[in-house]
Amino acid sequence: MANKSTENGIYSVSGEEKKGPLIAPGPDGAPAKGDGPAALGAPGSLLAVPPRETWTRQMDFIMSCVGFAVGLGNVWRFPYLCYKNGGGVFLIPYILIALIGGIPIFFLEISLGQFMKAGSINVWNICPLFKGLGYASMVIVFYCNTYYIMVLAWGFYYLVKSFTTTLPWATCGHTWNTPDCVEIFRHEDCANATMANLTCDQLADRRSPVIEFWENKVLRLSEGLEVPGALNWEVTLCLLTCWVLVYFCVWKGVKSTGKIVYFTATFPYVVLVVLLVRGVLLPGALDGIIYYLKPDWSKLASPQVWIDAGTQIFFSYAIGLGALTALGSYNRFNNNCYKDAIILALINSGTSFFAGFVVFSILGFMATEQGVHISKVAESGPGLAFIAYPRAVTLMPVAPLWAALFFFMLLLLGLDSQFVGVEGFITGLLDLLPASYYFRFQREISVALCCTICFVIDLSMVTDGGMYVFQLFDYYSASGTTLLWQAFWECVVVAWVYGADRFMDDVACMIGYRPCPWMKWCWSFFTPLVCMGIFIFNVVYHEPLVYNNTYVYPWWGEAVGWAFALSSMLCVPLHLLGCLLRAKGTMAERWQHLTQPIWGLHHLEYRAQDSDVRGLTTLTPVSESSKVVVVESVM
């Protein structure tokens, strides 16, 4: 433990035993980065510590969280899961798991960031032995930043192609079309077919121009992962444009990001309302909405329904990525993060439910026009965005207008999720750097390097075999399995190692009152049990990755996928094991020492109630003349 002395009510710690970004000085005597100006080091020494940014207005934080958490999954995944898993019945497990798992962890991550004033890694100074959770979240969000932007690139490509009198995916006869291309078909035309359970496309071996545009023009799909092929330069330019947009949204920090999200987070709602009004006026729209909500009570007995509800909650709430922690770290210390978390969770789930009406009104129209059951046109993920919906708009009057509106909404939904994800990664990265490494334009250069590295990796996804690479990232790197693992350990560490009551007191110190005891019980029991239960089910019933129900990935492709997943999941046990092995003393002494919190400089405003700084459990406001500097000792 560090040597401590007290002078005029201020604790000081010997410089050679201090480390990390929350205190100063570094090995060369230069100040380390912190959260506010302070006097540190030997008595009488003054070290300037750069202040941490805060949101200009609290609404900036709200809109940033809405922009990040409300994304493509709310629009293209939730409606399909609701339809597939019993319609309105799916809302029962969805709401239950949101109350038991989603909202408590959502609140936990935001409040942790606000209390510790640190990004995804240094926030775990609250229990340094489990700092591997921070490294794991950095790995996951890096993967997300890498592959998620591909959806933006495809959406931008479709948006550009929408500015024509005739949509290119509406007709055959293009260079990318095959002789099997057919523009319009109806199920009644197959009345004489011998296999009534097949569609016209399947019976006649015909292909829609929408599918051929997607596979032959946009993806230029090769035979498999082992055949990468050449770059698609049109999509590559769209990808580059998206990364440039992300860079200029993030490069100046949260003060500029907080302004941009006012547009990127709100305008998609305007488009959703416009699309809903248009959709409900189309023939067959009511049938689609009925199928979306029609309850099938037998589905409640299916474990898969509960698994789908759980994975959707954790994915759509953006839990385990560290970005919510980073956003919360820019709040004022006394911001009511409890109220914010409840509001944001309601907005997130409400958007998912509302988007279902938009999607299924269009799918109902599409099924009516083609004379097929809605199950034949209902899709999720990229299949909905780039096949089902583009096909539906070709059947509407003024098709280019509705296509442009949809893909512009898609671009905005993905853009704010993307640049807030990059913001979370950069925040965690810069928090690690001591002030001795500080230089002008540090943030701008760091963001540029991050965007460039991700862009180079993304080039593997704009080749002919790029879709297979994208699917690997999507299925393994930031899957429900990795997020559930992350959420489980977050709850265990805060509730059982740091202490649930202790953290409730810390939250009360920030917001002025203790949150509902339900939060404490969820962190301690219900949420970890739900997370581990769904995690085990996912692992036991894991199915090998298959693309489009036809292409089975080779064994080495599966191995790469599992490497993605394990690269984040192993951060927690490996870091824990490494710290315990390096520490000295008995195992009990090592555990006790390594689980003691490391307090940051922003706690200057608060006093430890007992004389041992390392034993801080409750913080209370004090006057300017009686502050305590709480710092870390060497691990």
Curated annotation (Swiss-Prot):
Glycans are attached at residues 192, 197, 548. It is found in: Cell membrane; Apical cell membrane. Keywords: Cell membrane, Glycoprotein, Ion transport, Membrane, Phosphoprotein, Sodium, Sodium transport, Symport, Transmembrane, Transmembrane helix, Transport. Residues 1-60, 109-138, 252-269, 326-341, 416-444, 501-520, 582-635 are cytoplasmic. CDD domains: SLC6sbd_CT1 (cd11509). Its main location: membrane. SUPFAM superfamilies: SNF-like (SSF161070). It is a multi-pass membrane protein. GO terms for cellular component: apical plasma membrane; plasma membrane. GO terms for molecular function: creatine:sodium symporter activity; gamma-aminobutyric acid:sodium:chloride symporter activity. It comes from the Eukaryota. This is Sodium- and chloride-dependent creatine transporter 1. It comes from Bos taurus. The lineage of its organism: Eukaryota, Metazoa, Chordata, Craniata, Vertebrata.
